[in-house]
Each structure stands twice: as C-alpha cells, then as structure tokens.
Swiss-Prot record:
Belongs to the PAPS reductase family. CysD subfamily. The gene is cysD. This is Sulfate adenylyltransferase subunit 2. It catalyses: sulfate + ATP + H(+) = adenosine 5'-phosphosulfate + diphosphate. GO terms for molecular function: ATP binding; sulfate adenylyltransferase (ATP) activity. SUPFAM superfamilies: Adenine nucleotide alpha hydrolases-like. Heterodimer composed of CysD, the smaller subunit, and CysN. Keywords: ATP-binding, Nucleotide-binding, Nucleotidyltransferase, Transferase.
C-alpha cells in the first residue's frame, strides 16, 4: 500500500513529546500575535516563567532579532539578584529592554512596607503597567501567566481582550476552538496574550532543565537571612525592611518557588540546590507555588479584582 493510501495512524510520522507540543503551541501563539497586531511587547518580570517565555520568543523569531521590546515594570522593591540578572541577560542577548516605574508612586514613596501590599500593588504594578502601555502605545502584551497558578488565571483565555482602560471583563471572553485565536479589537482596546497558559509549574522546570535556560539564583536553595512574619519566611534583602520588635534575621537554607517584591514574597525551607532536586520537590508539592505571594491574600477574589483593574 502506498504511503498516500495508508491510514493516518500507520504513517511513520515522528511523535512530539509533551514539552515539544507545548513549545510548538507557544511559538505559534507568538508568531500569530506578531502577525496580527501593530505594536506588541513582552512583559518581563525576571522570574522563571519570563525566562521560559523569552527563550521561546528567541526560538520563534530566530535567527532574527525579537520583533518587539521587553518591558519590565520596576516597583523598586525587587530582589537585588533579580535586577542584576535582568541587566546581565539584557546585555548578553542585546535585548531592547524598557524599564518603567510609576513616577507619581515613586515621588510619593509608595512601598509595600509603608503602604501595604494592596496599595503598593495597585500603584506600582497595576497603574504603572497601564501607564507604560499607554506611553508606548502597545496594542498587545505577552505575559507568562499560567492557568495552574491561580483561579482567575485558570478561566482567562490565551488571548485576553482588555478595554481602553486596560480592564478585563470575564464576560467578554472569546471562544478559542481548535487553537484558533481571535486577535481582532476595536480602536483603543488592547490584548494580553499568554503563550504559557497550558503549561504547569512542572512543565516549566522540565523545560528549563531540558533547554538549559538561565534563571535567577534565588530559585536554588542557599543560606539566606530571613525573618518569620505572618507565617511567611521573608528575606531581609536590604536595609529598607524594618525589623519588628523581637525580630532577628537568621540564616536558613531557603529558596523561592515564585518571585516578586521581596517584602511580599515568602521563601520555603529547602535543600534543593539543583534542577533535578527542584523537579523532585515540585512533584511532591501539595500546595500552589503562589502560597508565598502576599498579594494573593488581599481578600477573597483578590487576583481577579486586580486583573479587572488592569493587573496582568
């Protein structure tokens, strides 16, 4: 029987692995978005998901340069190692990196310690992101959010329509059958695009190991100065974190499953100092990686409310 007449199941076609399928889907989403929008940008938060997203983008558009810039919304409260890693990667890869900080929030001295997590996140993240998107007139923004991270992200589409005020309305979500993505929008509207939506935390780590993707050292276990506060191990990254009465930083072997502003990000005690050890911990984990993110605890439905206000 000729190959043309063989049943599809009998054709000697190479089978893609699980990670190859995820990679192909993400690359397709990126290329489709670039083809259908005028001025896209990639949000770069410096974490493991952003590192994977950047790696996929470099693959998607190789051997050419990325057809969009990277945007980092800098709250001024990221871990020092994160900023050093960001600058080193941008220099190494020759990236077009935009760094934006809310000037009003900076002038008012808004911070997670002085104003609390909710005000800090709104002013220095949500408002700052909206300002940056408006300033540079971006009509589509790639992000590294995944559906397995948190409930509101689980129900958001891969291509998420935002209003002219950058708000997300869950009732206006579009169907995405057969990997078909509707990238149409009215004047003033914009899109948030999530190529990693169908990845899990385990997928991310397996891909990082497979592709040897550089990541911030904070993900690996090491002795770090921490204080226990409200059930979280908070790293004392610089002198701006005031110690409460009776608090004394102590060195513990910890690492971070997720990264954000350091006073709002809890570490986990761990001996995992290599990628295989991190993968083993991830397989055994019974809690979400975002259990250490204080901003997710700002009341019931906190993340969905933030997204409706323009948060990523």
């Amino acid at each position: 029987m000729s190959a043309a007449l063989k049943p599809l199941a009998q054709l000697d076609t190479p089978r893609l692995t699980h990670l190859q399928r995820l990679e192909a889907e993400s690359i397709h989403i990126m290329r489709e978005t670039v083809a259908e929008t005028e001025n896209p940008v990639m949000l770069y938060s410096i974490g493991k998901d952003s590192s994977v997203l950047l790696h996929l983008a470099l693959k998607a558009f190789a051997p050419g340069r990325l057809p969009f810039p990277l945007l980092h919304v800098d709250t001024t409260w990221k871990f020092r190692e994160m900023i050093a890693f960001r600058d080193a990667r941008a220099k190494e890869l020759g990236l077009d990196l935009l760094v934006y900080t809310n000037p009003d929030g900076l002038a008012r001295g808004i911070g997670p310690v002085s104003h609390g997590s909710e005000v800090h996140t709104d002013v220095m993240k949500t408002q700052a992101l909206r300002q940056a998107l408006d300033k540079y007139k971006f009509d589509a923004a790639f992000g590294g959010a995944r559906r397995d991270e948190e409930a509101s992200r689980a129900k958001e589409r891969i291509v998420s329509l935002r209003t002219a005020q950058h708000r997300w309305d869950p009732k206006r979500q579009r169907a995405e059958p057969w990997h078909l993505y509707n990238l149409k929008k009215k004047r003033g509207e914009s899109l948030r695009v999530f190529p990693l939506s169908n990845w899990t935390e385990l997928d991310i780590w397996l891909y990082i190991e497979q592709e040897r993707i550089p990541i911030v050292p904070l993900y690996f276990s090491a002795e770090r100065p921490v204080v226990r506060r409200d059930g979280q191990l908070i790293m004392v990254d610089d002198e701006r974190l005031p110690l409460e009465p009776g608090e004394t930083p102590e060195l513990r072997k910890v690492r971070f499953r997720t990264l954000g502003c350091y006073p709002l990000t809890g570490a986990v005690e761990s001996d995992a100092a290599t990628l295989p050890e991190i993968i083993g911990e991830t397989l055994a984990a019974r809690t979400s990686e975002r259990q250490g993110r204080v901003i997710d605890k700002d009341g019931a439905g906190a993340m969905e409310r933030k997204k409706q206000e323009g948060y990523f």
